[in-house]
Amino acid sequence: DLITNSYTRGKPRHVTSWRNLRTRDVCKKSPGKCIHNGCFCEQDKPQGNCCDSGGCTVKWWCPGTKGD
């Protein structure tokens, strides 16, 4: 999907940037909301946020959405 890391032809694909996610309306405008992959969407969070270039870590998964 747009956010999680995946591999294409053996090369890792980078996590979609915050700006691109906002442009695509993937992230909610208000912080703390869950989006389709279960990450909390907060621009100002340190490492591990789905809308940051660092990607999304387990810490920010919303309950019950890890399988999405």
Swiss-Prot record:
Location in the cell: Secreted
Keywords of the record: Disulfide bond, Neurotoxin, Secreted, Toxin
Protein name: Conotoxin Cal12.1p1
Superkingdom assignment: Eukaryota
Gene Ontology CC entries for this record: extracellular region
GO molecular function: toxin activity
Chief location of this protein within or outside the cell: secreted
Distribution of this protein across tissues and organs: Expressed by the venom duct.
Maturation and modification: Contains 4 disulfide bonds.
Propeptide: 1-23
Secretion signal span: none
Disulfide bonds: none
Entry's free-text remark on domains: The cysteine framework is XII (C-C-C-C-CC-C-C).
Organism name: Californiconus californicus (California cone)
Regions annotated as coiled coil: none
